[in-house]
Curated annotation (Swiss-Prot):
Protein name: Crossover junction endodeoxyribonuclease RusA
Family statement drawn from the similarity comment of this UniProt entry: Belongs to the RusA family.
Binding site for Mg(2+): 76, 78, 97
Species of the source: Aquifex aeolicus (strain VF5)
Quaternary state and interactors: Homodimer.
InterPro entries named in the record: Endonuclease_RusA, Endonuclease_RusA-like, RusA-like_sf
Listed GO MF terms: crossover junction DNA endonuclease activity; magnesium ion binding
Domain of life: Bacteria
Length: 126
């Protein structure tokens, strides 16, 4: 089990696919995720499960996110984070994203590279 005092660092090799405006609603009303979304989710969940073997975190946490971007193209960071929280839940890293009490996000441009560094630690109230 992961100690509440321990900092956890995880890495994803691909940037999150932003959550909104990526779903297809045909006439039947059922929502489908495009392959780009489902492929990213499956890969991210697998990568997280390979790195995180403990029980899902069930206490208040602070999360530091470093988004490694391959270029200066505009990206929807808020929706990328929503996708990230979802896969962290599905992979069993966190019990629920409502346990995230503090978020610090940094964009880092590294030409030709991409990924996400996730650092999780217990939340300490100011």
């Amino acid at each position: 089990m992961i100690s509440e005092m321990e900092e956890i660092e995880l890495y994803l090799s691909k940037l999150p696919v932003p959550k909104s405006n990526r779903y297809i609603r045909p006439k039947g009303g059922k929502v489908f995720k495009p392959p780009r979304v489902t492929n990213w989710e499956a890969r991210a969940i697998w990568e997280l499960r390979e790195q995180f073997k403990g029980d899902a975190i069930d206490y208040e946490i602070s999360v530091d996110i470093t988004l490694i971007l391959p270029n200066r193209r505009k990206r929807d960071i808020d929706n990328m984070l929503k996708s990230l929280w979802d896969v962290m839940e599905k992979a069993g890293v966190i019990k629920n994203d409502n346990l995230i009490f503090e978020v610090h996000t940094v964009k880092k441009i590294e030409k030709g590279k991409e990924g996400v560094i996730i650092k999780i630690r217990p939340f300490q109230s100011p």
